[in-house]
Amino acid sequence: MASSGRYKVKFRRRREGKTDYYKRRIMVISGKPRLVVRFSNRYVLAQVIVSAPQGDFTVAEASSRELVKKFGWLGGTGNTPAAYLVGLLIGYRALSKGIKLAVLDVGLHRVTKGGRLFAVVKGAVDAGLEVPHDEEVQPSEDRLNGEHIAQYAADLKQSNPELYKIRFSKYLARGLEPENISKHIEEVKSKIMEKYAKSEAKAEDSQ
């Protein structure tokens, strides 16, 4: 941190709103892996990071882009259901690397009760990863299952078919009727769980 007179220039990443060094120091000192969740304009990204004297190491990583490429996800890549599925994926991957607990690292993002951040946490916890948090901040099951999207789509389709086609054009182009998104979420969730169940079975057989 540079200084001149009474004014101190903050570290670049703090000025850019990327790193809270005070919170980061506390988490690094704890020695526990960190569950880092970030959002871009289109995607959800989750990482499990371990800090060492040499620097930070990414142990596991998952993104909503992978949901499309590897698990056939047809829904939006930045919404609450996608965030939940990313959490499920990062949870299984962390466990496969021997990580059983991770501390949530929200960076400088504003924490909102029931938001996408906690949808990721819920997914990771459902996978079996321990992430200390208050369960009251988790999104409702209706939002995790996409029922709010399905209901809105069904109502809009009936009241304004043209707007329905415009609003859900990407869903429809991929072959998914948004009214059926809850069923699709369960299908993708099953694919993720099945993949890692097989991975665990192979690991046990090799021992």
UniProtKB/Swiss-Prot annotation:
NCBIfam families: PRK08569.1 (NF006342). GO terms for biological process: ribosomal large subunit assembly; translation. It comes from the Archaea. PANTHER family: LARGE RIBOSOMAL SUBUNIT PROTEIN UL18, RIBOSOMAL PROTEIN L5-RELATED. One of its GO terms (molecular function) is structural constituent of ribosome. The keyword Zinc does not apply. The keyword Ribosomal protein applies. Belongs to the universal ribosomal protein uL18 family. Keywords: Ribonucleoprotein, Ribosomal protein, RNA-binding, rRNA-binding. This is Large ribosomal subunit protein uL18. Pfam families: Ribosomal_L5e. It comes from Caldivirga maquilingensis (strain ATCC 700844 / DSM 13496 / JCM 10307 / IC-167). This is one of the proteins that bind and probably mediate the attachment of the 5S RNA into the large ribosomal subunit, where it forms part of the central protuberance. The gene is rpl18. Part of the 50S ribosomal subunit. Contacts the 5S and 23S rRNAs. One of its GO terms (cellular component) is cytosolic large ribosomal subunit.
